[in-house]
A protein has these predicted regions:
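Bacterial N-terminal signal peptides that target proteins for export
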Residues: 1-7
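Charge-dense, intrinsically disordered terminal/linker segments
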Residues: 8-9, 330
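Intrinsically disordered, low-complexity segments enriched in polar/charged small residues
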Residues: 9-10, 178
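C-terminal motif of bacterial Sec signal peptides marking the signal peptidase cleavage site
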Residues: 16-19
Length: 359
């Protein structure tokens, strides 16, 4: 029963703190949404495993100039793209031991099998003009790779291994002195082992008998005021297959966060305007239900979120624009994850014993 309550609390936390996008739902009250989440958690069978898919795209542009005869002008462009796919599976036998309370005999190294692939790129473009002389630098960085985690035997070592490869490609083009133009590529292969036992030892050696004291206090009334104010930007919806939370994002929301958080900027730093949302956007968080009424998938979606920022200080003008698109999907999965085999270890692999590293 406790696990069901924890699942409901987790779902509610995900839904209120963080997709896919806008769906046809009927508006409901917050109390109804909480009730539906409770019911869904009670109807959810334990997930054997899950899959995760994430994509993100962030674009930032900025212009900088000096009011003193326009001696200095600069423009900046930054593009970030990221994608991730992964899956994990729980070992049913080891999970059964945990549920029965037989934690001493759990083989934690054999508890989880997982795999992950990721691809990321960053493009940085800066142009600066000083006294009509233009300099520029363009950098493209691509980072990708894959990870696998599970228990296996390799090089006469039986343990849980985190095996991965990281591929990096960097391209630089510039007319600035001292810059190394050209393309560089690098691949690294790692095999980290004794992970579960190291974590278990760390947790087991934590002294919980003496709780340290602290003089730090948190003003709960301030947090309550902020949450109460933000509540007006949050709405709930549902249909037969989904429970949805929508968070409206606009310039008034940011202004309320600043005001209720007592965030004040000193006047001596110059004439500054707070970040302003230039395009109406929203964050959609969805909890999908299976045929039994239990949770089958969670998603978070942020699309076409646009922010602008302006700043002026002693003749220096700055204007920045940022556009954000983000999607995350976590799904229940019964598909078995491929176990680690010898073929996953490259000849160039660097074996790292985590237990030795942490000594």
């Amino acid at each position: 029963m406790k696990s069901k309550k924890y699942l409901c609390l987790l779902a509610l936390s995900v839904l209120t703190l963080t997709g896919c996008g806008e769906a046809k739902v009927s508006a409901i009250e917050k109390s109804d949404a909480i009730s539906k989440l409770n019911t869904a958690s009670e109807n959810t069978e334990n997930w054997k495993g899950f899959t995760i898919k994430e994509t993100a795209k962030i674009s930032v542009s900025g212009d900088f100039s000096s009011e003193v005869n326009n001696l200095v002008t600069s423009s900046l462009k930054l593009d970030v793209n990221s994608s991730l796919k992964g899956s994990a599976e729980l070992n049913a036998d080891e999970m059964a031991k945990i549920k029965s309370g037989d934690v001493e005999n759990v083989d934690y190294a054999n508890l989880v099998t997982a795999s992950l692939t990721t691809s990321n790129s960053v493009k940085y473009d800066l142009k600066t003009t000083i006294n009509s002389n233009e300099s520029y630098v363009t950098t493209d960085v691509n980072i990708g790779g894959s990870l696998k985690y599970g228990k296996t035997t390799y090089n006469n070592i039986t343990s849980d291994f985190l095996v991965g490869n990281i591929n990096t490609k960097t391209k630089v083009k510039s007319n600035m002195q001292g810059t190394n133009n050209g393309t560089t590529e690098k691949s690294d292969f790692y095999g980290v082992y004794n992970i579960a036992s190291s974590v278990k030892n760390i947790v087991g050696n934590i002294d919980t008998s003496d709780t340290p004291s602290t003089d730090v206090t948190i003003d709960s009334s301030l947090l309550e005021k902020l949450v109460a104010k933000l509540d007006s930007y949050i709405s709930f919806g549902a249909n037969d297959n989904m429970i949805q939370v929508k968070i409206d994002v606009n310039d008034q929301l940011l202004a309320d966060i600043m005001a209720n958080g007592n965030i004040k900027l000193p006047s001596e730093i110059g004439d500054i305007t707070l970040p302003k949302v230039t395009a109406e956007s929203a964050i959609y968080i969805n909890a999908y239900l299976d045929k039994n009424g239990g949770f089958s998938k969670f998603s978070i979606d942020v699309s076409k979120l646009s922010l602008s920022f302006n700043y002026n200080l002693s003749g220096l003008n700055m204007a920045c624009q940022a556009d954000v698109n983000y999607s995350l999907i976590i799904s229940n999965s019964s598909k078995e994850v491929d176990l680690i085999t010898a073929s996953d270890f490259s000849k160039e692999v660097q074996l790292i014993d985590l237990s030795t590293l942490l000594k």
